[in-house]
């Protein structure tokens, strides 16, 4: 009697995607973000006039008054693009570093307010002070050239954080003299006479300043030496020549609609300011048009005894090259 043949079932086939799930998900998210950015640029360009203009701020017209007109609708017009392009995430990361006496210039509609780690004085419903909340921000001064933008930002703060004291809202040009931190904070810190800020914040502000170099130099005068930091999230020229050509071509139309010149050379502006670069990099998924920048006030030449013969401008350039190239 023949022996029955025993056949075993074939081994299960391995899932070819088993070890590729994370790369596929990451790649899909990256592709979606980049596609969204391209869509945003296309939609914006389709509404703008095509007239190539210079990227130099000295040759660009002042469009800052546009913000008084669009202040009430500004948040609605940029909310979805900032979320899709992960600019909101960059804001959160930037604001997590703010501490002490904080100055935010180009406050706009206050899109950063909810991301600060507030530690301001509290008051009850009757206006009586009842202590201080725990947090890193001890005082807050906001500046913007647009009165309507400041009004929107202040209203937003009062809704988000009712009962908090220690904020000041100033309508003015941030490239001119800015008030020192509140006197009570200075006395509490025991640094009476220095009167400088611990942190200066600006997001998407260099694009609308008439003289961005003068603005940065003024911020350098406002921040503490050594420990103070100027934290910027900005947009300007990108990594590719063709993209910069597109930005130049449609810059005027975009400026008239949104009040900002999106084709400025941020690297050149930063270097011309004379401030020391702590960290600076462009966001690759935006084609290099969005920049994270951390600056500090340079030490006085007399204190740099080891290299006084090196001009400050050259020294800053060499430091930047070490960080970038």
Segment roles from a protein language model:
Residues 7-63:
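N-terminal auxiliary segments of SAM/dcSAM-dependent transferases
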Residues 213-228:
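A short glycine-rich, Lys/Arg-flanked "PGG" loop and its adjoining helix->strand segment in the class I
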Residues 80-81, 231-292:
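C-terminal alpha-helical "lid/dimerization" subdomain adjacent to the S-adenosyl-L-methionine
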Residues 187-191, 195-212:
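A short SAM/SAH-binding and catalytic strip from SAM-dependent methyltransferases
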Residues 100-183:
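Class I SAM-dependent methyltransferase SAM/SAH-binding core
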């Amino acid at each position: 009697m023949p022996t029955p043949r025993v056949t075993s079932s074939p081994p299960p086939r391995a899932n070819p995607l088993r070890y590729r799930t994370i790369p596929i998900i990451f790649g899909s998210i990256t592709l979606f973000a980049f596609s969204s950015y391209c869509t945003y640029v296309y939609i914006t360009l389709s509404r703008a006039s095509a007239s190539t203009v210079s990227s130099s701020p000295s040759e660009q017209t002042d469009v800052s008054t546009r913000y008084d007109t669009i202040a009430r609708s500004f948040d609605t017009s940029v909310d979805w693009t900032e979320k899709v392009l992960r600019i909101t995430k960059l804001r959160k990361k930037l604001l997590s570093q703010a501490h002490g006496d904080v100055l935010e210039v180009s406050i706009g509609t206050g899109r950063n307010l909810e991301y600060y780690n507030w530690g301001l004085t509290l008051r009850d419903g009757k206006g009586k002070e009842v202590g201080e909340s725990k947090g890193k921000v001890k005082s807050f001064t906001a500046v913007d050239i647009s009165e309507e933008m400041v009004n929107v930002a202040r209203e937003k703060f009062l809704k988000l954080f009712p009962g908090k004291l220690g904020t000041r809202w100033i309508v003015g040009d941030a490239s001119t003299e800015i008030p020192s931190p509140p006197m009570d904070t200075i006395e509490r810190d025991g640094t009476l006479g220095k009167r400088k800020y611990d942190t200066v914040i600006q997001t998407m502000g260099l694009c609308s300043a008439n003289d961005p170099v003068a603005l940065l130099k003024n911020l350098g005068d406002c921040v503490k030496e050594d420990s103070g930091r100027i934290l910027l999230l900005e947009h300007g020229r990108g990594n590719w020549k063709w993209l910069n050509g597109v930005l130049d071509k449609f810059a005027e139309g975009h400026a008239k609609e949104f009040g900002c010149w999106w084709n400025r050379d941020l690297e050149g502006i930063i270097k011309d300011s004379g401030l020391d670069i702590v960290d600076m990099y462009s966001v690759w998924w935006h084609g290099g048009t969005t920049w994270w920048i951390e600056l500090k006030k340079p030490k006085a030449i007399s204190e740099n005894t080891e290299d006084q013969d090196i001009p400050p401008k050259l020294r800053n350039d060499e430091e930047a090259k070490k960080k970038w190239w």
